[in-house]
C-alpha cells in the first residue's frame, strides 16, 4: 500500500470514529431543540471552526484556487443538507445505533450509483452485499407486524443522499482547496437548515444552552474537522474505497449508543446489524472482482 493511501485511510478512519459518536450528540440534542435548529447551529459552528484554517492557508497555492468553488460547494452542500436533514429528523423517532447502521447503507448504494453513471457492470459482490444489507435492514427496522418504523425510513433516505454526496466529493476533492470547499458546503447547509427552522421551529435560548457540549462536538468535530478531513482524505482514496472505511461509522455509532445512551439492541436487531455490516464490506471488497 502506498504511503499516501495509508495516510488517507487513517484519516478517513478517524472521520468514521467522529461521525459514529456524532449520532450520540445528535440524539441528545433532539431532547431540547428541533432537528433543523440543531443542524443549523452546529453547521454555523462548523463554519466558524474552518475560518482559522482558511486564514493560515491564505498564501498557499491551493488556497488561491477559487474558480467554480462556489458552484461546487452549493451542489455538495445541497446534498449534504438533504442527507443530514433526513438523518436528524429520523433520530427523533429512532435510536442512535440503528440510525448509524441504516445511514451506513450508503456504502452499498455508492457502487450502484457508480454503475449507473459510469455504466459499469454489476459485480457479484455488489449483489451479495445488497442482498445481505437488505435482509439486515429488514431484521433491524421492520417490526413483527411487518411495519417499518418512520424514523428508519427517513434515515434510509439520508443514506441515499449521503451516497450522492460521497461521489460528488470524490470528484471535487482534487479540484479545490479543502477548507474553502468545506466552508462553502457547510455554509449552504447552515443557511438552509436555519431557514427551515425559522419557519417550523421555535428558538429557546435556555434549551440551546443545555446542549452546548453536543452542539460543540457536532459543530466543531463532526462538521468543521470531519468534513474537512473527508475532503482531504479522499484526495488519495476513490469513493468506493472510502466507503469501506466509512462503513465502520455504524459500529462506532452502536458503541456510542450503548456506552453513553444505554441503548440495547435485541437479538433480532443485532443480527440485522451484523448482516448489514457484512453486506457493506462485501459490496466494497468485491466491487471490482
Q: Could you tell me what each predicted segment is?
A:
Residues 1-37, 78, 86, 144-171, ...:
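Glycine-/small-residue-enriched transmembrane alpha-helix faces in small-molecule transporters
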Residues 43, 51, 55, 211-213, ...:
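C-terminal-most transmembrane helix of multi-pass membrane proteins
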Residues 50, 122-142, 160-162, 191-193, ...:
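Hydrophobic transmembrane alpha-helices of multi-pass small-molecule transport proteins
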Residues 39-41, 99-105, 169-191, 223-259:
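Helix-helix packing/entry segments at the starts of transmembrane helices
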Residues 20, 24, 51, 77, ...:
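Hydrophobic/small/kink-forming positions within alpha-helical transmembrane segments
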Residues 37-48, 88-119, 124, 158, ...:
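Specific alpha-helical transmembrane segments that line the substrate/conduction pathway
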Amino acid at each position: 500500500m502506498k504511503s499516501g493511501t495509508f495516510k488517507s485511510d487513517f484519516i478517513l478512519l478517524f472521520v468514521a470514529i467522529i461521525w459514529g459518536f456524532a449520532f450520540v450528540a445528535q440524539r441528545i440534542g433532539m431532547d431540547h431543540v428541533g432537528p433543523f435548529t440543531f443542524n443549523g447551529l452546529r453547521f454555523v459552528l462548523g463554519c466558524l471552526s474552518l475560518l482559522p484554517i482558511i486564514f493560515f492557508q491564505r498564501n498557499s497555492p491551493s488556497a488561491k484556487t477559487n474558480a467554480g468553488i462556489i458552484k461546487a460547494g452549493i451542489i455538495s452542500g445541497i446534498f449534504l443538507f438533504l442527507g443530514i436533514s433526513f438523518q436528524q429528523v429520523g433520530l427523533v423517532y429512532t435510536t442512535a445505533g440503528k440510525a448509524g447502521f441504516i445511514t451506513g447503507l450508503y456504502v452499498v448504494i455508492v457502487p450502484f450509483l457508480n454503475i449507473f453513471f459510469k455504466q459499469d457492470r454489476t459485480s457479484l459482490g455488489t449483489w451479495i452485499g445488497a442482498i445481505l444489507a437488505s435482509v439486515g435492514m429488514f431484521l433491524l427496522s421492520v417490526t413483527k407486524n411487518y411495519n417499518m418504523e418512520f424514523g428508519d425510513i427517513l434515515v434510509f433516505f439520508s443514506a441515499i443522499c449521503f451516497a450522492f454526496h460521497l461521489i460528488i466529493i470524490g470528484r471535487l476533492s482534487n479540484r479545490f482547496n479543502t477548507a474553502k470547499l468545506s466552508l462553502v458546503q457547510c455554509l449552504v447547509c447552515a443557511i438552509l437548515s436555519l431557514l427551515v427552522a425559522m419557519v417550523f421551529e421555535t428558538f429557546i435560548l435556555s434549551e440551546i444552552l443545555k446542549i452546548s457540549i453536543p452542539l460543540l462536538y457536532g459543530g466543531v468535530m463532526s462538521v468543521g474537522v470531519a468534513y474537512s478531513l473527508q475532503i482531504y482524505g479522499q484526495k488519495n482514496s476513490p469513493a468506493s474505497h472510502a466507503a469501506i472505511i466509512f462503513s465502520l461509522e455504524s459500529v462506532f455509532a452502536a458503541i456510542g449508543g450503548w456506552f453513553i445512551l444505554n441503548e440495547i439492541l435485541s437479538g433480532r436487531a443485532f443480527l440485522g446489524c451484523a448482516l448489514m455490516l457484512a453486506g457493506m464490506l462485501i459490496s466494497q471488497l468485491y466491487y471490482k472482482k
